[in-house]
Amino acid sequence: MTQNYRITLLPGDGIGPEIMAVAVDVLKVVGQQFDIQFDFQEALIGGAAIDATGEPLPSATLDTCRQSDAVLLAAIGGYKWDSLPPHQRPEGGLLGLRAGLELFANLRPAQILPQLIDASTLKREVVEGVDIMVVRELTGGIYFGKPRGIFTTETGEKRGVNTMVYTESEIDRIGRIAFETARKRRGKLCSVDKANVLDVSQLWRDRITKLSQEYPDVELSHLYVDNAAMQLVRAPKQFDTIVTGNLFGDILSDAAAMLTGSIGMLPSASLGASGPGVFEPVHGSAPDIAGLDKANPLAQVLSAAMMLRYALNQPQAADKIEQAVLQVLEQGDRTGDIMSVGMNLLGCRAMGDSLIKALEKS
């Protein structure tokens, strides 16, 4: 029986349209193989939306996304729009999309692929077998807390203020996502906070600990954020799933990403309690290589696989895509960002063709 899904495509800026085209071709192939019908709707976001409509997130785009089963995003931003005020820049489109879809959980995997292990800056024995999922709270914490701003005191001195705030319900909902994620993986969850200094972290630790009683099959541990950062570099294989707040997650997810050696290989997902999630590569829009057929489409393709797994409940189709990625790497196919001696240098389109062949053979 054919299953039908409505997918909003947001190619965005820079290399976005190129890598999105590869991901769509891959989805069409697995759709045929698994009797899945995709209804793709393309919409504007970021710089492309600014050029066309004057705003980074047109209301029509948000409406289209809300009516979808999932949103696949490519890349946002570029030098062209850097002179705009911060609230008018392309990146504001992503923030607006997250808020409009009420997405509060960001899932960032960091997995060492055997074929690329030497790309890591750490020793092989340290990173071999690393497979981490960072679950970051996305809409609370110090980035959104109030009061905030730069004020002038009675003495005329400038004073900058930001406020880290979390409510019990905000902690509980991200905690549930993290426990459920850990349950589907290796059953280990590490909660990262700064409870030895911050009151908000004491509440965080208390709520996560209480929530763990509902998940007796998941092993819970706690680390202070400074120790967690050190342990990610010293012994990353100890981690399975990490859950943490917005600020700490912003930092730790990038640190975990660089264990892999190439940010161009990493997908991500942003999820809410209901409604469509947004799936996108971690890397930026790379305007310097846009249109030159040099982009690495693999993170975009792996983001499509995450979409199949987490939004559409199609784990077998997701597995098929992930295995195809491993296969093309195993046969030595590389784009410039992951190229090494003796490998086959391919452009974006040719890498897509190689993926299609791998999917059709398997």
UniProtKB/Swiss-Prot annotation:
Q: Name the residues annotated as site: Important for catalysis.
A: Y143, K194
Where is substrate bound in this sequence?
A: R98, R108, R136, D226
Primary enzyme class: oxidoreductase
Q: Name one GO biological process term.
A: L-leucine biosynthetic process
Q: Which residues bind NAD(+)?
A: 78-91, 284-296
Q: Which Pfam families match?
A: Iso_dh
A GO molecular function assigned to this protein is: NAD binding
Q: Where are the transmembrane segments?
A: none
Report the catalytic activity.
Answer: (2R,3S)-3-isopropylmalate + NAD(+) = 4-methyl-2-oxopentanoate + CO2 + NADH
Enzyme Commission number(s) of this protein: 1.1.1.85
Q: Give the protein's recorded name.
A: 3-isopropylmalate dehydrogenase
